């Protein structure tokens, strides 16, 4: 249930709980939370067991399509093509992506800095400032 929660997140939750509840009420809150989670887990496993008892062999008939749907949920278009059309041979995708890797490398490399020729850039000649009566 909390498989994606790491130690860092648990530490943050503990510190927030310590600040919000205080050191006196925090152990009781942790105890209540663990008991509640245990009750929910027992209730869910009990519901599964009671369904299995009531449905009998039909439970497996219901469970098989759900397991197939679960497998399909994780399928990406690339995985579907590899499995069904290419019989698991993934080398076609490697040959297609190899030229793209060269393009990515060329795009991500910084462009060389242009060399500026100082002889081409001449300052303006001193003299009177030009005045355009139509522009003002």
Curated annotation (Swiss-Prot):
Region annotation (Disordered) ranges: 107-136
Cited InterPro entries: TatA/B/E (IPR003369), TatB (IPR018448)
Signal peptide extent: none
GO biological process: protein transport by the Tat complex
Keyword line: Cell membrane, Membrane, Protein transport, Translocation, Transmembrane, Transmembrane helix, Transport
Location of the protein in the cell: Cell membrane
Gene3D superfamilies according to UniProt: 1.20.5.3310
GO cellular component, one term: TAT protein transport complex
Keyword hit for Ribonucleoprotein: no
Transmembrane domains' residue ranges: 2-22
Membrane topology: Single-pass membrane protein
Keyword Oxidoreductase: no
GO molecular function, one term: protein transmembrane transporter activity
Function according to Swiss-Prot or TrEMBL: Part of the twin-arginine translocation (Tat) system that transports large folded proteins containing a characteristic twin-arginine motif in their signal peptide across membranes. Together with TatC, TatB is part of a receptor directly interacting with Tat signal peptides. TatB may form an oligomeric binding site that transiently accommodates folded Tat precursor proteins before their translocation.
Subunit architecture: The Tat system comprises two distinct complexes: a TatABC complex, containing multiple copies of TatA, TatB and TatC subunits, and a separate TatA complex, containing only TatA subunits. Substrates initially bind to the TatABC complex, which probably triggers association of the separate TatA complex to form the active translocon.
Family: Belongs to the TatB family.
Protein's recorded name: Sec-independent protein translocase protein TatB
Originating species: Mycobacteroides abscessus (strain ATCC 19977 / DSM 44196 / CCUG 20993 / CIP 104536 / JCM 13569 / NCTC 13031 / TMC 1543 / L948) (Mycobacterium abscessus)
Lineage: Bacteria, Bacillati, Actinomycetota, Actinomycetes, Mycobacteriales
